[in-house]
């Protein structure tokens, strides 16, 4: 069985081919049973973190399952909040084919999915990117978005300014025009694409800040209690999702619905429908578009297949 650690997994998932692989699997489809999310309690009964189990398979090809842990309190101990492992098997025999670093796979396929969505939903001339958050996933947003839009300027905001400054510095080392910002409202108003990748449980981006033509990419929340944008963002936007699962699990949408600002019938399409040409993306330059992703095992399988095939070549 092939073993790919974090560095090897990253090397085998360059963003342009990964975006193409995701597009292809969204078009062809695969079997994706409901994922399981389990809250892991502390001894006092409060929630320490969550464990996610995400299987998917293509009959006659490969099957895979990812186990991911998300423990936000880890950052206070100098640890990553996200850990995971992915196992790829032969769907005909069940023979294990490869083990990949789940956190690296998750990070890269997540931002690649956002970039794939932006290829349909962001304005063609979108060049100003705002990254909200400074964690593992945020580190790769600019690279992925640059594959689909002419990103020329990146700004970074984080609830801890030091995190934003550190990420902006790393981006500058890679040749990106990047700066950390303190004023989130002003940064949102200046951006063409706003990409949020946090574990926030309260709204960070307010709808009144969004100017016409903005694309809002919401990556972080995956439970009903989490949200990165307020209800006004959802009310003003043409909403798209990575899958229908977002309607049941994304706090950004569920809490907006509770406020009367959103209903499931208002979703303009899923990413699969966009990729298959079944739904139109952005209609004009003045629309505000919103893409909410919660992740799916299809996305993991596409990345794992690409990494495994590349390692065999």
Residue spans of the language-model regions?
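Adenosine-phosphate binding glycine-rich loop
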Residues: 226-313
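Conserved beta-strand elements of the Class I
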Residues: 128-130, 289
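N-terminal ligand-binding/catalytic initiation module
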Residues: 1-107, 115, 125, 269, ...
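Rossmann-like adenosine-cofactor binding region
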Residues: 174-261
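NAD(P)-binding Rossmann-fold cofactor-contacting core
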Residues: 148-174
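Short helix-loop-beta connector
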Residues: 121-128, 211-212
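Glycine-rich Rossmann-fold phosphate-binding loop(s) that bind the pyrophosphate
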Residues: 134-135
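N-terminal Rossmann-fold NAD(P) dinucleotide-binding loop
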Residues: 138-139
């Amino acid at each position: 069985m092939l073993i790919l650690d974090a560095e090897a997994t990253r090397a085998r998932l360059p963003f342009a081919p990964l975006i193409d692989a995701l597009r292809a699997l969204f078009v062809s489809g695969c079997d994706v049973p409901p994922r399981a999310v389990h809250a892991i309690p502390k001894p006092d009964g409060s929630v320490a973190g969550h464990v996610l189990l995400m299987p998917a398979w293509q009959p006659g090809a490969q099957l895979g399952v990812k186990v991911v842990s998300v423990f936000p309190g880890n950052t206070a101990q100098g640890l990553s909040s996200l850990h995971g492992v992915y196992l790829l098997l032969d769907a005909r025999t069940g023979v294990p084919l490869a083990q990949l670093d789940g956190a690296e796979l998750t990070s890269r396929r997540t931002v690649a999915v956002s970039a794939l969505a932006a290829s349909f939903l962001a304005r063609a001339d979108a060049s100003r990117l705002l990254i909200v958050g400074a964690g593992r996933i945020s580190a790769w947003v600019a690279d992925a978005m640059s594959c689909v839009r002419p990103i020329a300027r990146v700004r970074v905001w984080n609830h801890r300014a030091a995190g934003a400054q550190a990420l902006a510095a790393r981006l500058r080392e890679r040749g990106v025009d990047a700066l950390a910002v303190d004023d989130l409202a002003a940064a949102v108003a200046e951006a063409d694409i706003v990409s949020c990748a946090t574990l926030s449980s309260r709204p960070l981006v307010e709808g009144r800040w969004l100017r016409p033509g903005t694309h809002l990419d919401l990556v972080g929340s995956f439970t009903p209690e989490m949200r990165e944008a307020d209800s006004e963002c959802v009310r003003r936007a043409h909403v798209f999702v990575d899958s229908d699962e977002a309607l049941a699990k994304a706090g950004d949408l569920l809490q907006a619905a509770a406020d009367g600002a959103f209903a499931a019938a208002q979703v303009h399409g899923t990413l699969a429908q966009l990729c298959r040409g079944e739904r139109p993306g952005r209609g004009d330059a003045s629309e505000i578009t919103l893409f909410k992703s919660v992740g799916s095992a299809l996305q993991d399988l596409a990345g794992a297949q690409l990494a495994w095939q590349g390692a065999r070549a």
